[in-house]
Every structure is written in structure tokens, then in C-alpha cells.
Swiss-Prot record:
The gene is dapA. HAMAP family: DapA. The record marks T44, Y107 as: Part of a proton relay during catalysis. InterPro entries: Aldolase_TIM, DapA, DapA-like, Schiff_base-form_aldolases_AS, Schiff_base-form_aldolases_CS. It comes from Pseudomonas putida (strain W619). This is 4-hydroxy-tetrahydrodipicolinate synthase.
Length: 292
């Protein structure tokens, strides 16, 4: 079962924007050694928007091979074109992914019926577990709870990453779906509360730099130990906040360089973290106990 702390993995690059396979392997090993429950490759944090289709497949294949079945590998395969999303999802299945994460179509702003038909078509076209991903702050399109509940009965659609941070919405989804449908947070600050409501885990940016702590948080919350889970969350709150001082994944990539886990590299139109944010991120790493 897919549950717990699922890292939204960055895609390491060099100064010229070329994929850095050595650092990617190091990051996968870092998560395997520190209790991460699943890896989400080539999602938003993995800069999927600026990877070619060939690179997309190569990253999934690399991560699947490195993980070697020890934890699930989930591939980001969403697109604002239904046919492209089918193509990416089939590629991810062929590359060995355990499941796919499909973001709500961005820019073209489909209706709720359009969203239903989009995700239903992909689920019927490719036989692989699929997780919906609602993040209206990035897509400018908000999938309502009623649409999620409707999609929850479609074969191959197994869950949703709900990244709004709206706990009332999360509860409405949880109340309307079967117990087998996985509701996950995509918002680090509120993830603990969503899990305590009945969610199954968190697809996390913070887990890139604090995998052990995020795994402990999710495990405590899944066990119903609210006091322990909230205490860990409070310690991680500086990271939850300051890893978004600029657009994700800019700050978290800077943090990983500071930790010695990868080299400096990002693709335009994203740029490296501005100097005014450097100390914010370093301070958050120290306050959360990641750096001393």
C-alpha cells in the first residue's frame, strides 16, 4: 500500500542544466537510508515541466533501478493535454513505475466535467495505479471534492494528492470515498492534520532535506499519536515555510547543495535562489536540526 512519507524528489542538474545522474543516485540512497516510504519522481519538484519526454523516461528508469523494489516509485505524468498525459503514463508504466501522479490540467481551465472525463480517459487507457493531484495555486484550476468522489470509483484511480491545505475539503473527500481510496496531503504544514483526519500520508517537499523526520511524523500520525506528530511538525515548520521563500524547487535545491547532496543546477525559466533568501534557508535548516 502507498502510504507514509513520500518525497517529491528533485531532479539534480549541473551548472549547464544537464541531468546529474551521480547526485540523483546519491539522493535515492539518502532516502532509502532514512526511512522515506515512497519516491515521487519527475513531479513539480522534479522540474517535469522542463524535462524532455526522453529525460522523463530516463529519470523514472534510473530511480526504479536504483530503488530495486524496496519502496514504491511514483512517476509524475500529468499534462494539460489528455493524449500527452496518456503517452507519459504509458511510458512510466513501461519504465517500471509502481504508480503515476497526474496533476489537474493547467492553463486551459477545463470544467469539472472536463476534469472527470480527462482522468477517466487516462485511467481507462493505461492499466497502472493513478493518483490525482489537485494544486490550484499552480494550475489555476480547482478540482472540487464532488469530482474527486466521482472519480474515486473509476478503476485504476487509487487516490489523490490534495495540496490546497484545506482540511475541510480533505474531510469532505474522506467522507465521500471508500476506505480503500488514498487521500494524501501535498501541503507540508497541514499534512499532519490531514493524516489525523484519516489521510494516508504526505507527498512532501520538506522530506527532500529531512527524510527521517518526515517519515517519523507520518508514522506517528498514522498510528494516531497526535502529540508526537505535532511536535515533529512544529520542529519542521521553519522548513515548511522557508523552502517556499521562492518558487519550488528553487529553495530546496539550494538547501540540498548546502547539505552537500548535489551540485548547483536548475533549468530556465527557473533561476538559482536569490542571495536575499540564502540565510533564510540556512537558518531553517539549522532550526530544524538538519544542519548544525
Amino acid at each position: 500500500m502507498i502510504a507514509g512519507s513520500m518525497v517529491a524528489l528533485v531532479t539534480p542538474m549541473d551548472a549547464q542544466g544537464r541531468l546529474d545522474w551521480g547526485s540523483l543516485g546519491k539522493l535515492v540512497d539518502f532516502h532509502l537510508e532514512n526511512g522515506t516510504h515512497a519516491i515521487v519522481a519527475v513531479g513539480t519538484t522534479g522540474e517535469s515541466a522542463t524535462l524532455s519526454v526522453e529525460e522523463h523516461i530516463e529519470v523514472i528508469e534510473f530511480v526504479v533501478k536504483r530503488v530495486a523494489g524496496r519502496i514504491p516509485v511514483i512517476a509524475g505524468t500529468g499534462a494539460n493535454s489528455t493524449s500527452e498525459a496518456v503517452h507519459l503514463t504509458q511510458n512510466a508504466k513501461d519504465a517500471g513505475a509502481d504508480a503515476c501522479l497526474l496533476v489537474v490540467p493547467y492553463y486551459n481551465k477545463p470544467t469539472q466535467e472536463g476534469l472527470y472525463l480527462h482522468f477517466k480517459h487516462i485511467a481507462e487507457a493505461v492499466d497502472i495505479p493513478q493518483i490525482l493531484y489537485n494544486v490550484p495555486g499552480r494550475t489555476s484550476c480547482d478540482m472540487q471534492a464532488e469530482t474527486v468522489i466521482r472519480l474515486s470509483t473509476v478503476p485504476n484511480i487509487i487516490g489523490i494528492k490534495e495540496a490546497t491545505g484545506d482540511l475541510a475539503r480533505a474531510k469532505a473527500i474522506l467522507d465521500g470515498v471508500s476506505k480503500d481510496f488514498i487521500v494524501m496531503s501535498g501541503d507540508d504544514p497541514t499534512a499532519v492534520e490531514l493524516i489525523l483526519l484519516g489521510g494516508k500520508g504526505n507527498i512532501s517537499v520538506t522530506a527532500n532535506v529531512a527524510p527521517r523526520e518526515m517519515a517519523d511524523l507520518c508514522e506517528a500520525a498514522l498510528e494516531g499519536n497526535a502529540e508526537k506528530a505535532r511536535a515533529i511538525n512544529e520542529k519542521l515548520m521553519p522548513l515548511h515555510k522557508d523552502l517556499f521563500c521562492e518558487a519550488n524547487p528553487i529553495p530546496v535545491k539550494y538547501a540540498l547543495v548546502e547539505m552537500g547532496l548535489m551540485q548547483k543546477g536548475i533549468r530556465l525559466p527557473l533561476t538559482w535562489l536569490s542571495e536575499g533568501c540564502h540565510e533564510k534557508v540556512r537558518t531553517a535548516l539549522r532550526q530544524s536540526g538538519v544542519l548544525v
